[in-house]
A protein has these predicted regions:
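N-terminal Lys/Arg-rich, disordered targeting/topogenic segments
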Residues: 1-11
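Intrinsically disordered, low-complexity acidic Ser/Thr-rich regulatory segments
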Residues: 92-95, 185-219
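Feature for secretory/organellar precursors and membrane-associated catalytic proteins
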Residues: 13-24, 29-155, 160, 165
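Conserved small/polar residues in nucleotide/adenosyl-binding loops
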Residues: 279-285
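Catalytic Cys-His active-site segments of thiol-dependent hydrolases/isopeptidases
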Residues: 125-179, 183, 208-211, 215-233
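Short acidic, Gly/Pro-enriched loop/turn segments at secondary-structure junctions
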Residues: 127-136, 266-276
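Extended, hydrophilic extramembrane loops/domains of integral membrane proteins
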Residues: 212-275
Length: 289
């Protein structure tokens, strides 16, 4: 009799199955949120900019992978420079097949497809001065900082007031300290060795070189593991870099307010299914990167 009732009322059966599916998805989302502290708790990787092996491998990020997004403080992000510095407490720290953390961020803090790339180094203000706070909102750096320096609208002065003129920079994990411009050779001497996986030719080295960079503001320099040293911040930071672009232009150093999260565990092998199919496979609101 029970089988006959189920067969005679397919609508009830459909509703029951849908409620069960929604409940299971809800429990999964809550469990992932409890683990990561982030919502949505994972992202779907579309780009091949982080792959280490064209055939895919466990332990690095491939197109099609699902990657957990951990809600971590900006100050806890470990850069490649720090993780390859023997004198740094984070020496040897590695994630997804290489030293340093992989972060997910909004391009220039704007809406759009986020980026998942590795944090290579951080530029931190050393000497700062107080800007002219009476200039209009659209004032240039020269107008805001008549005594020199680069205006950083988010860095705070000693009184906790946002907006300073940065005169010199530090780069933790490297020999760069109190420098007006940032030059770092990741050659294993001045900083940890970063292999560009490209042959040296003309003025292009086989390792990563940041040369006389004048950062727009404090933040992280980022790079896809498979991008052959073409950093997100463009040619002003590294010669020959095409950069990552948003509606407002080339991405600047990644600010804390742009950080979505830090890449955690991956769910591999889903890359064998084309990302276009993920609308049927992923959790609701799962973004693509």
């Amino acid at each position: 009799m029970g089988d006959q009732e189920r067969q005679s009322d397919p609508l009830k059966l459909l509703v029951r199955e849908l409620l069960l599916a929604v409940g299971m998805i809800g429990l999964l989302i809550l469990g992932l949120y409890a683990h990561t502290g982030s919502m949505p708790p994972l992202v779907v990787v579309e780009s091949s900019s982080m792959i280490h092996d064209s055939n895919g491998e466990v332990g690095s990020i491939d197109a099609g992978d699902l990657v957990l997004v951990h809600n971590r403080d900006y100050d806890s992000v470990v850069t490649f420079a720090e993780a390859t510095d023997e004198n740094n407490p984070h020496f040897g720290y590695a994630q997804h097949g290489l030293e340093g953390d992989v972060i997910i961020y909004k391009k220039n803090g704007e809406d759009g497809t986020p980026i998942i790339h590795r944090a290579i180094m951080e530029v931190v203000p050393n000497q700062i001065s107080t800007p002219d706070r009476n200039v209009p909102m659209n004032a240039t750096d020269a107008e805001r900082c008549p005594n020199g320096g680069t205006y950083d609208s988010e860095w705070k002065d000693g009184n906790g007031t946002k907006g300073v003129c940065v005169l010199t920079w530090d780069v933790p994990g490297t020999s760069v300290q109190d420098s007006e411009t940032v030059s770092v050779s990741f050659d294993g001497d001045q900083a940890g060795y970063y292999d560009c996986k490209r042959p040296a030719h003309a003025n292009v080295e086989s390792h990563l070189v940041v040369w006389e960079w004048q950062p727009r503001h404090a933040g992280l320099l980022t790079l896809g593991d498979n991008n052959k040293c073409s950093v997100d911040q463009g040619s002003q930071a590294v010669n020959g870099s095409s950069g990552v672009h948003s509606a407002s232009g080339t991405v600047g150093p990644i600010r804390s307010s742009w950080l979505i999260g830090v890449g955690g565990g991956e769910i591999p092998w889903l890359g064998t299914v084309k990302p276009v199919s993920y609308t049927h496979l992923t959790l609701p609101t799962t973004p693509y990167v």
